[in-house]
Amino acid sequence: MVVIRMARGGAKKRPFYHIVVADSRSRRDGRFIERLGFYNPIGAVAELRIDKERAAYWLSQGAQPSDTVAGFLKKEGVSKTGVASV
């Protein structure tokens, strides 16, 4: 199964996450199929950037987002049917 999840990067006590499409059997920070964006929770304002068109494509192909990534996608207006225009 293909999943959309976060892969941790950064240093100790300074997390940084890549939002990736990966096989569910691969390690959290291991091999991935495509990088869709990133999430940086550290700083004055948490920074989130996602390629909405590619995320919508992978959702339409049956990729299952993790709970956290599903919340991010909903916040950004991405669904299985495509990108919602705001």
From Swiss-Prot:
User: What are the record keywords, sorted?
Assistant: Ribonucleoprotein, Ribosomal protein
Any one of the GO CC terms = small ribosomal subunit
Entry GO MF terms: structural constituent of ribosome
Coiled-coil region: none
Q: Which residues cross the membrane?
A: none
Pfam families the record matches: Ribosomal_S16
HAMAP family (alphabetical): Ribosomal_bS16
Q: Which family does it belong to?
A: Belongs to the bacterial ribosomal protein bS16 family.
What protein does this entry describe? Small ribosomal subunit protein bS16
